[in-house]
Design a protein with these regions (language model features):
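A cross-kingdom feature strongest in bacterial/archaeal respiratory oxidoreductases
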Residues: 30, 35, 320, 359-365, ...
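Short alpha-helices
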Residues: 396-397, 403-436, 477, 590, ...
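A glycine-rich, hydrophobic/aromatic-adjacent loop/helix-cap motif
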Residues: 463-532
Length: 778
């Protein structure tokens, strides 16, 4: 550690720390505009000047590293004059529009002007005015206010990786613009409004809506993806104004999906009253009438239950209590993206924190579009790549990352066994073995050279394996994950403290779901097939919309019209056309509850907002159904319900009373031993379905802000490599029959792969493993 003196007080900091950061860490206030802890140092504003004993002139503290014994002073008469001079320069062209600026009342420029600025300006020349440009749906501009700190430019280059913003001209003509109109393409673009210190870049959806002192701030957890980011919900009354990252949270950024989904809270798609279908219409009724009708449809029937994993821990546990009490033989499913429901050798969830993934020697991404699936984690990997650390990627498509992975390999999904077997061959030659490896690779005849890339990465001292949706949704996923488990154990990456086995889950609470539902779960595809074959009499949907999400929209549409359906949730979605009863459940912003993210971090959230209608927390809806079905209500308050959580998932026992951060480990199943199955008859093309940040999930589709952004990222119906299929209309043959699709061409798709880019259009083939096509070459 390095010892220095700040305002005569001795402090210690890590060597290499800047003076400004040392002052921030120890409570010594130094004004600054251009510095940001997550961005490179620019030293543009010169507001952070400090005096260092023995130095002839003040130093910019943001770019000056500490030294042993250094004596720093942050306040003096000379520094005050310097800061007054810099404020005068910065304010020369800045408009006096604080009363109408969204930043007014929460603006560093205002605060520092009061503290360091003059009461009257001396500049008498013509002030500069800058033309504003439309940057996209999320950011509003007033660039006349810009002080050229370049935070936005550095963010676009270093964090987003898009380079959308740039500096033009110099001197008094200097200006910051987007490269073209409507140019922002990053999944983190909303962060530009957060990092701008002066109100030049503003949040467009909340522009001119409220003043900072009118807003109430509530800490909560975003449930829009497995990352489960810490967020602050800003509201006026019970209306959400904006969502921002929690400053004390793990990640400094949140994605645009988590930031702008809030307009769905008051969407017309919200279920706010109980309803019963009468003819073609769903009509509002009382809770008693709706519950009574649900009991008529469900009691004594063979029931299927399909739910979303994004509910709170308490809500999900209540679903299991309802099943145990009233529907003991029910078929239960919750994963719309998984075909193989056998136990995995390592269950869903991350064994590492995102910081550990950023720091390890090697990272290998297997079959995942992280930019769409987990944009905040992708930012970590982008940061890692930019610092010179390797990231390798194997999959059916070289997904856009706004950076360049160190190594890329394109493969077809049918080649995954050959890739893993090739990696096993190489690590075996290096003398690294695990019991069962010879038997596994002996079951695979083919070899694929992409396995060499995987094996090379595994030979590092530390390695993080990020297993994505291409493997999770594979028909033989259990054997593939067992093969990867063997590789990681052979190479020493499965030990406690260095476990690099990370399986990206579909949603939140993966650790809970494997404990609470692991013994009764089935695949969504099997559930719909059972319904279509007459093996079920009724269906309960809890926050799930299989017509718009997952791999089985065609199967869901065929099955749902054949049986009565009770829909419980916050968003109606496309599946509501089949609902006979709707019961409103409160949104995640309207409940007190617990959530577990993919790292196993337990987040306990209060109730930020009140319900907008007669919605109730999901667990209360479940308990009401238990009572109406004639069962004994197992819990009447959260404390009683949490005792059932602890019984079903012992790893959560006591987390609500514990102090500090709680992390739940990911399950490891030594008995999940599965060898690769023999390939069945396959079609010409392998099918891979796209996950869209702006379209996946009923919440996203109910948000006008996100659907508008999604249109800007629209692709063809399906995509193939030009060597596979020429662009244009083609007839695709599958088990569902023949259908014509508009095929687009991309060279970043593996030959022999048909990439379903628009599931709403091409849902008829999204559940297929392989298909045939007229014409084309493979």
């Amino acid at each position: 550690m390095t010892a220095l003196f700040i305002n005569d007080e001795e402090v210690t900091v890590t060597p290499g720390t800047s003076i400004l950061e040392a002052c921030r860490q120890h409570g010594a206030e130094v004004p600054y505009f251009c510095y940001h802890p997550e961005l490179s140092v620019a030293a543009n504003c010169r507001m952070c000047l400090v005096e260092v004993e023995g130095w002839p002139k003040p130093a910019a503290s943001c770019c000056t590293p500490v030294a042993e014994g250094m004596k720093v002073r942050t306040q003096s008469e000379g520094l005050e004059k310097d800061r007054q001079m810099m404020m005068e320069y910065l304010l020369i062209h800045h408009p006096l529009d604080c009363p109408v600026c969204d930043q007014g009342g929460a603006c560093k420029l205002q605060d520092y002007t009061v503290e360091h600025g003059a009461s009257q300006g001396r500049y008498t020349e013509m002030k500069r005015a800058v033309v504003d440009h439309d940057l996209g749906p999320f950011i509003s501009t007033c660039m006349t206010r810009c002080i050229h700190c370049t935070r936005c430019v550095r963010f676009a280059d270093e964090v987003a990786g898009t380079g959308d913003m740039g500096v033009l001209d110099r001197g008094d003509h200097m200006r910051i613009e987007g490269i073209v109109d409507d140019c922002l393409s990053s999944e983190l673009s909303g962060s530009l409004g957060d990092i701008c210190p002066v109100g030049a870049l503003l949040d467009k959806p909340s522009h001119d809506v409220s003043r900072p002192w009118e807003v109430t701030r509530h800490k909560s957890t975003c449930t829009q993806c497995p990352q489960g980011c810490d967020i602050t919900i800003e509201s006026r009354g019970d209306e959400v104004i904006r969502i921002r990252p929690d400053r004390e949270g793990v990640e400094p950024w949140i994605c645009d999906r988590g930031r702008y989904v809030y307009d769905a809270f008051r969407s017309d798609e919200r279920i706010v009253e109980p309803k019963i279908r009468e003819g073609d219409a769903l009509n509002s009724v009382s809770w008693d009438d709706a519950i009574g009708r649900a009991v008529e449809l469900l009691k004594g029937k063979r029931v299927g239950i399909l739910f979303s994993p994004f509910w709170s821990v308490e809500g999900l546990t209540a679903i299991r209590l309802l099943q145990d009490s009233s529907f003991k033989d029910a078929k239960v499913a919750f994963d719309l993206h998984r075909r193989d429901m056998r136990q995995f050798a390592f269950e869903e969830g991350l064994a590492m924190t995102t910081q550990q993934i950023e720091d390890v020697d090697q990272v290998v991404v297997l079959g995942s579009d992280l930019r769409q699936r987990l944009p905040v984690l992708m930012q970590r990997l982008r940061k890692r790549i930019n610092s010179g650390k390797p990231v390798s990627r194997i999959g059916a498509m070289n997904y856009r990352t706004n950076t360049h992975p160190t190594h890329d390999a394109l493969i077809r999904p049918r080649d995954w066994p050959a890739v893993i077997a090739r990696a096993m061959d190489q690590v075996t030659e290096m003398g690294k073995l695990a019991a069962g490896m010879d038997e596994w690779r002996g079951a695979v005849k083919e070899r694929h050279e992409a396995g060499k890339l995987l094996a090379d990465a595994l030979m590092a001292d530390s390695c993080a394996l990020l297993v994505g949706e291409e493997i999770r949704s594979h028909a033989d996923a259990a054997s593939l994950i067992y093969g990867l488990d063997l590789l990681m154990r052979a190479c020493g990456h499965a030990e406690e403290g260095s476990d690099g086995r990370n399986l990206i889950p579909e949603g939140m609470n993966a650790q809970l779901l494997s404990s609470v539902f692991g013994d009764i779960r089935t695949s969504a595809g099997e559930l719909f097939n059972a319904a279509a074959n007459g093996e079920l009499d009724a269906m309960i949907l809890v926050g799930s919309d299989p017509l718009g999400d997952g791999l089985f929209p065609a199967e869901a549409k065929q099955a749902m019209g054949k049986l009565p359906t009770v829909q419980i949730g916050a968003i109606a979605g496309e599946i509501s056309q089949f609902a006979d009863v709707q019961l409103p459940a409160a949104a995640y912003s309207e409940v007190e509850g617990s959530f577990i993210n993919m790292e196993g971090r337990v987040r306990i959230a209060g109730q930020p907002l009140s319900s907008i209608g007669s919605e109730r927390p999901l667990w209360k809806v479940m308990m009401r159904l238990v009572q109406a079905m004639g069962g004994e209500v197992p819990a009447i308050n959260l404390d009683e319900l949490r005792s059932h959580v602890a019984r079903l998932a012992p790893q959560l026992d006591g987390v609500w009373d514990a102090e500090g951060e709680i992390v739940i480990g990911t399950a490891r199943n030594k008995g999940a031993v599965f060898l690769p199955s023999k390939a069945k008859k396959q079609g010409k093309l392998d099918v891979v379905s796209r996950y869209s940040l702006y379209r996946e999930g009923a919440w996203a589709r109910a948000s006008e802000l996100l659907t508008d952004a999604g249109r800007r990222h629209a692709l063809d119906d399906v995509i193939a490599h030009p060597d596979t299929l020429a662009a244009g209309e083609h007839t695709i043959r599958s088990s569902a029959g023949e259908k014509k699709f508009n095929v687009g061409n991309r060279t970043n798709v593996a030959p022999g792969v048909l990439f379903v880019a628009k599931r709403g259009v091409a849902g008829d083939i999204s559940s297929e493993l392989t298909v045939d096509v007229d014409g084309g070459a493979v």
